[in-house]
Amino acid sequence: MNTTDDVSCAEIYVSGRVQGVYFRGFTQKTATSLGLMGYAQNLPDGRVKVVAQGKRSCISELLDHLHIGPELSNVECIEVGWMGLSDTFTDFFIKR
């Protein structure tokens, strides 16, 4: 049974004006404050990919923040896929 305290992993794709507007830094700061591990990465197609591991409730809270984004961003769409824990991260970082 999945509860909000289960450790989960989400693969998130954020579309819109999300590159060059501090979106990855915003994501890293927010995820770290929520105790999440993983990374944020710019993709060649203009999206940002986020992999977040931690309590499902914290990932859901991160998603709420990502919908808003930093001041200069304009989030148009967020796609979320829940996946098994394949990698173990020790922090939340910006992947280049």
From Swiss-Prot:
Top-level taxon of origin: Archaea
Acylphosphatase-like domain mapped to chain residues: 9-96
Keywords, sorted A to Z: Hydrolase
Pfam families: Acylphosphatase
Catalytic function, reaction form: an acyl phosphate + H2O = a carboxylate + phosphate + H(+)
Residue numbers annotated as active site: R24, N42
Protein name per its UniProtKB record: Acylphosphatase
Gene coding for it: acyP
